[in-house]
Amino acid sequence: HAVTADVSAAVKAPKGASTLPDVLTVDEVTRLLDAAAVGGSTDPVVSRDKALLEFMYATGCRVSEATGANLDDIDLDEHIARLMGKGSKQRLVPLGSYACRAITAYLNAGRGELEQRSSAKIPERRALFLNKRGKRISRQSVWEIVKATGERAGITKPLHPHTLRHSFATHLIQGGADVRTVQEL
């Protein structure tokens, strides 16, 4: 009897070894966040970059959550941010004091100036983070900010916005946080 079906067609190849994501040390995160402030607190772009990176590290948010964040998603009095995640899932995450201070400084000094730069007839009033032209910041801009700030901080390992998310989770777990709780953040 001849075999007419390829019995090996249903067999799946074993998965290759997955690599662990790049994670910054606590010292590298500190250097990154310090480097974001280089250029002075009066420059609205510097103020925005510092607030953006503090926000991303403090919340462990995805880039899309940072770019999609609106002013009314932030409660600085309660130290809480409302994030809209994948699948339109909303979650509340705590905002640390460093992030709250950086966001407050940005809102008090930088954001208004960036909003005034808009050439649009109706300025962007909702977005938390604005680009140099007063519009909602893009994913690409966030990537460029993270990369440029990492270079200024002397960080040589691969660095991208998601690295902050991985670092956030890793540092929480290293600090004793429950893995299930971190997964929900």
Model-assigned labels for residue ranges:
Residues H1-L185:
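Conserved catalytic core of the tyrosine transesterase superfamily
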